[in-house]
Amino acid sequence: MFNMNVDESASGALGSSAIPVHPTPASVRLFEILQGKYAYVQGQTIYANLRNPGVFSRQVFTHLFKRAISHCTYDDVLHDWNKFEACIQKRWPSDDSCASRFRESTFESWSTTMKLTVRDLLTTNIYRVLHSRSVLSYERYVDWICATGMVPAVKKPITQELHSKIKSLRDRCVCRELGHERTIRSIGTELYEATREIIESLNSTFIPQFTEVTIEYLPRSDEYVAYYCGRRIRLHVLFPPAIFAGTVTFDSPVQRLYQNIFMCYRTLEHAKICQLLNTAPLKAIVGHGGRDMYKDILAHLEQNSQRKDPKKELLNLLVKLSENKTISGVTDVVEEFITDASNNLVDRNRLFGQPGETAAQGLKKKVSNTVVKCLTDQINEQFDQINGLEKERELYLKKIRSMESQLQASLGPGGNNPAASAPAAVAAEAASVDILTGSTASAIEKLFNSPSASLGARVSGHNESILNSFVSQYIPPSREMTKDLTELWESELFNTFKLTPVVDNQGQRLYVRYSSDTISILLGPFTYLVAELSPVELVTDVYATLGIVEIIDELYRSSRLAIYIEDLGRKYCPASATGGDHGIRQAPSARGDAEPDHAKSKPARDPPPGAGS
């Protein structure tokens, strides 16, 4: 699963004292927790907001828009305005060219067109950058930070395909179809340069998956090293872990939540097992009893004894006596037994003519005095022997089942050699049924086939009777633990990254947004350390939640281009005539002598300070 192939030179550099940091069973589980494998609760959904790259996209958009629109001079804007005004004067009669409403309309048309053109140029090309596929992944960066506090980064060269895309981007940014407007050309050229830098930076750095990196700690040099595909790569240790006695404890949110997450997960697993075991609700306690044991003895004697077996006859007598609850019934049974037995005896008194009691009377007396006691002792002995045999039988059956389970586990699925079937056994284990997510029938079958658990449901067997029955539906409560884990996730993420919740009028949280501290803690290292975008300014928390259209309006309103256009408007279309006409152009002579002195007193058209910058 993990790509840990380090070349010989690299492994020699590690030395025998290197402590493995990742991948280890503990570190891998941290990433699996982020992927929702263990006890995914509602509070973990905040993490989805945290790793959303929307804030970074707004930061790139703000940087490109602000840098491009600020790369214009007052001379370029003035040149474009003069060119536009000259075209308007050619199209309209000269008598109307100096009318106040006409001047306002002309300037408003030009300023609005300039704004739309610049906005169209910038947004179209910036969107292509934001929505194009880049190698650098902000989501993986957040995963590494939240799991380990360290971020590996791989430098890679720019591909030829990317060079071709950058070249085509230059043609779109220069905007040849817009004519010879200096302002647009300056903005487009600067947009291309800024975009090229962003694209090259985002595609020259790669953050690998957690399954592709090996991280180790070197105690001798007190440094962490990372390897990717056999070669050493950069490793940004933002939050160093604690290492004690060879055990690594990361300084990360998921590491702090680890124990609580697995406590909740094991409780859910326990609840699922109880649910499966209690699918059949009727349970019974089964024990040994001798109430109907005589039937088994009679069946045994019937199969193994002779046709006329005295033990069988006497046992039948005892059975009949036990089934009769009245004195008359017992008397009838004894009389019947004596009659049957006396027919097979020789009456010596009748044969030799001796007086005294008859044979039937003597037999009756004998039965009443001694036979019953002897037979009872013998039957008790038989019962003890049968009970011992039954217990011995159950013991051997358990041993046979255990041996069969061990033999089946040691052999392969098809009964093959363990060495030959090792890959198949590993594959079967990997594809085993998950108790939490598997089907109920498969999970029950897995539980009852487990050799380590004596779980089963059976009907009472020989010499067993139901002593008590009850309904068992116990399932461990897990809702409270899940709720506590949700609150713990929220508290950890909010306090670690200083997130700001956004709530509605009812106080329900809609989503979370980046605060200024979040941008400094999370977005700052990604921008300057990982992506190496040193010219990019960190976005403010206000822009982090605004829409793109709102960001465009704010950036344009405070841009250099908007200030220059506003200054031209004040001079060309003054608010009142008392303040003097600070128009850019001289009033046409066709107006007559209505304002000769005023026209002559116009100031020189000097650009404002910093106009050439």
From Swiss-Prot:
Disulfide bonds: none annotated. One of its GO terms (biological process) is chromosome organization. Residues 592-605 have a biased composition (Basic and acidic residues). Belongs to the herpesviridae portal protein family. It comes from Epstein-Barr virus (strain GD1). Residues 577-613 are annotated as: Disordered. Homododecamerizes. Interacts with terminase subunits TRM1 and TRM3. This is Portal protein. Keywords: Host nucleus, Viral genome packaging, Viral release from host cell, Virion.
